[in-house]
Amino acid sequence: MTLVSKAISLLGFSPAKAPLISVVLHFRRPRALSDQDVQAAVTRAWGRDVRKELNEHIVSRPPISFVKFDRIFLMLSNVSKPYCPAKYLEQALKEFPELRQKKVVKEHKAFLSIDLQNPKAPRRSVKDDCYRRMCRLAAEFVDESCLGVYFPETAHLRPNDREVKNALRSDRPLKEITNWGEAHISANLRT
């Protein structure tokens, strides 16, 4: 323990945790995700296959897959249960005021998370590039079963609509994903 971290601990502050840099797709039902599915998605999303001579690879051990590509290392978790455990459902619903967001939280039965493993705590420009790659990969898995996309770092949940894939494939996905195609419908509206 460093002197600074010891002083912070003695003052009663917990050390700052690195934010979870992740893209989470919520699905209506569990989905199979084979090694070939991940391989094809990487090729479509990033324009080329992994190159062994560059020490790039994809390793799948369902429900987990690892992708090392260029300078990033990702973990994909394909889970056949809700992202939010039942005991936290009510609390999660309070975090999202919009009815379509609540629907995603309530109705999804499975999720696919794409988590950045390396680089750790990247500076802003590197993080933006990592998000671009992660979002482009996520777009390859968006289908009619996908209810929405969640970003744990920003706590933003975007319900799936006709523009989600375009937002994920854009050069500024974190900005574009917050631009919804339709007016928001709030649960707080009174009739």
Language model features with spans:
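Aromatic/basic-lined ligand-recognition segments
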Residues: 152-191
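A structural signal for short, well-ordered beta-strand segments and their strand-loop junctions
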Residues: 113, 148-153
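N-terminal low-complexity, intrinsically disordered segments
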Residues: 29-103
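N-terminal alpha-helical "arm" segments
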Residues: 1-43
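Glycine-rich, often proline-containing surface loops adjacent to acidic residues and nearby aromatics
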Residues: 19-21, 104-124, 191
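A short acidic (Asp/Glu
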Residues: 34-38, 125-126, 159-168
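Secondary-structure boundary elements
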Residues: 139-149
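Well-ordered, non-membrane alpha-helical segments in soluble/globular domains
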Residues: 90-95, 126-138
